[in-house]
């Protein structure tokens, strides 16, 4: 297969589902601080890790692989509460106020879009900042519009979507997940028993050409329907968990 690796040029929009959560605000704060030279990107393979070359010398991965520069990243996303990233990070109390204040202005500028949410899939949460949609298909169309609008408003060349929200309830793999046609039909028929909000986010991202990374262990991109859609659109999907067991309780 012929490789066609394009250079990472232009602005990269990173849209996070659960952008006001502890995981997201900690990640965003660290990234903003690192790109201002106020902190090191400890734990980041792309920024700190090295590769051994044929001559035996080591070079940083970011100097070899065509990756986005930290300065080109624009953060945004969705949340079930309207707090900006600074307010949300203060509430989470993962980082100290003095550390958050180093990038306070940037954090305050990150304001969430209303989330696609269903209380039945996250029973411990009661979101107040959520989308109104008659069907899962309509919910997905709203998310697609959000992605397009964010991309245009922030002059982004490309978008990636990351799920950093709470784990949804368990649902088994069903016939609606076996093919793209069946999945789309279930979304249009508003079969809320088998179509979760996370699936709506994943579908919307893929449809808009945005890679989707799943950060929770619930059923989402690990279905034949999503694999089919990913292959059809030539858009990467990945992930199953961000070790959520260490940082939050499943809902």
Where are the regions a protein language model picked out?
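Metallocofactor- and cofactor-centric catalytic cores in central/energy metabolism, strongly enriched
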Residues: 2-208, 212, 224-228
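Glycine- and other small-residue-rich loops at beta-strand/loop junctions that grip anionic moieties
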Residues: 194, 215-219, 240-241
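Short gly/pro/ser/thr-enriched loop/turn and capping motifs at secondary-structure boundaries
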Residues: 220-222, 244-245
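Rossmann-fold dehydrogenase core element
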Residues: 229-242
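Residue-level detector of conserved catalytic or cofactor/ligand-binding positions
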Residues: 245-251
